[in-house]
Amino acid sequence: MTGFFYFCTMKKTFKPGTMIYPLPVVMVSCGDSPDTYNIITVAWTGTICSDPPMCYISIRKDRHSHPIISRTKEFVINLTTDALAKATDWCGVRSGRDHDKFKEMHLTPEPAQVVKAPLIAESPLNIECKVVEIKELGSHDMFIAEVVAVNGDEKYFDPSTGLFQLNQADLITYSHGKYYTLGEKIGKFGFSVEKIQHKRKK
């Protein structure tokens, strides 16, 4: 058929599964008193609404943090970095039933602004959340939450603009069982339709 081109790629079909990668990997801190503080590493997390700011985490019922967050209805999402990679992984493969994760990973619990759950001081950005709904889905329960405060490490603020430079924090991501650092910037939001500014000749 003249004027039409057919391009076929060879695709292999997988069984249904979670293949949306890469993902953020975060340490979620919870508990309302020092004797109940715990950290769980979560990759099933993300933003679900801008206004009001809302996010979610999904946790298996048998995880130690599940009943803690179900009871307190709050948690803190702590972004993770290259320097925190070992602690991030360790907090995901060890149980708070058997370990004091803050102590054993040399992490510092810090008071939050709104919630009783602690911040992780070593994290560059801490997002305080209050649970508004728990949805039972299957292997995991989804904790839908409203963001009630955000705390950023002062060293990442640009003194001249006051903007928070998260790109300087060496954040890590998770993809199919492995951790990665982020690569180089390839564009910015809207760059595909941005008009090129030509300098006028003098």
Question: Could you tell me what each predicted segment is?
Answer:
Residues 6-202:
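Basic, polyanion-binding surface patches
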